[in-house]
Amino acid sequence: MTSITIALSKGRIFDDTAPLLKAAGIIPLDDPETSRKLILATNRDDVRLIIVRASDVPTYVQYGAADMGIAGKDVLLEHGGAGLYQPLDLNIARCRMMVAVRSDFDYESAVRRGARVRVATKYLQTAREHFAEKGMHVDLIKLYGSMELAPLVGLADAIVDLVSSGNTLKANNLKAVEEIMPISSRLIINQAALKLKRRAIQPMLEAFSAAITPLTPLSPYPLGATP
């Protein structure tokens, strides 16, 4: 019997993935939010789940420790996608990658003047490409969390981060000034596993595809002001 290992992360992505797993006949026997187990058995003897950090999902799949996984587009862009097949946009965990600044910072003026802007983010590669395309001079500062704090204490002029409702920006007196791209989660498959385990993987791929909620456009985000 061919076994399949699926890499997932806790939180919103796992919650949004549960209906897709169920559509493929896969039900975890433990709740990752309450269980300390990092390897979860399922109702199927041939499928197990491993729980890893969201940023590590592509690495586990790339090197074959997992056959499949679900990762956000933001994570995949930073990873680079080597060794991965990305057959499906699952339309889950949707948000935006945006540039945000303090509400009293004149970002547009800084861009026009060609001022050098300090930007805090954990998405260095994506941010570097975005600002290079705009011809902006930026100093990128790597952070791993609490991005909203950076402009408030003078560490950075701007941040690049994921935004859903915008409530966190509003609570910290920040405003979004640019949308870099929409973000959602993708199904990723190890390229070698797709060849060697296609008969086991293909039915899951088809079940996921059939269960995807049709995409509805994200409503416009109010740039230049806290929502």
UniProtKB/Swiss-Prot annotation:
<dbReference type="InterPro" id="IPR001348">
    <property type="entry name" value="ATP_PRibTrfase_HisG"/>
</dbReference>
<dbReference type="GO" id="GO:0003879">
    <property type="term" value="F:ATP phosphoribosyltransferase activity"/>
</dbReference>
<dbReference type="InterPro" id="IPR013820">
    <property type="entry name" value="ATP_PRibTrfase_cat"/>
</dbReference>
<keyword id="KW-0808">Transferase</keyword>
<dbReference type="InterPro" id="IPR018198">
    <property type="entry name" value="ATP_PRibTrfase_CS"/>
</dbReference>
<keyword id="KW-0368">Histidine biosynthesis</keyword>
<keyword id="KW-0963">Cytoplasm</keyword>
<dbReference type="GO" id="GO:0005524">
    <property type="term" value="F:ATP binding"/>
</dbReference>
<keyword id="KW-0067">ATP-binding</keyword>
<keyword id="KW-0328">Glycosyltransferase</keyword>
<protein>
    <recommendedName>
        <fullName>ATP phosphoribosyltransferase</fullName>
        <ecNumber>2.4.2.17</ecNumber>
    </recommendedName>
</protein>
<comment type="function">
    <text>Catalyzes the condensation of ATP and 5-phosphoribose 1-diphosphate to form N'-(5'-phosphoribosyl)-ATP (PR-ATP). Has a crucial role in the pathway because the rate of histidine biosynthesis seems to be controlled primarily by regulation of HisG enzymatic activity.</text>
</comment>
<comment type="pathway">
    <text>Amino-acid biosynthesis; L-histidine biosynthesis; L-histidine from 5-phospho-alpha-D-ribose 1-diphosphate: step 1/9.</text>
</comment>
<dbReference type="Pfam" id="PF01634">
    <property type="entry name" value="HisG"/>
</dbReference>
<keyword id="KW-0547">Nucleotide-binding</keyword>
<dbReference type="GO" id="GO:0005737">
    <property type="term" value="C:cytoplasm"/>
</dbReference>
<comment type="similarity">
    <text>Belongs to the ATP phosphoribosyltransferase family. Short subfamily.</text>
</comment>
<keyword id="KW-0028">Amino-acid biosynthesis</keyword>
<dbReference type="InterPro" id="IPR024893">
    <property type="entry name" value="ATP_PRibTrfase_HisG_short"/>
</dbReference>
<comment type="subunit">
    <text>Heteromultimer composed of HisG and HisZ subunits.</text>
</comment>
<dbReference type="GO" id="GO:0000105">
    <property type="term" value="P:L-histidine biosynthetic process"/>
</dbReference>
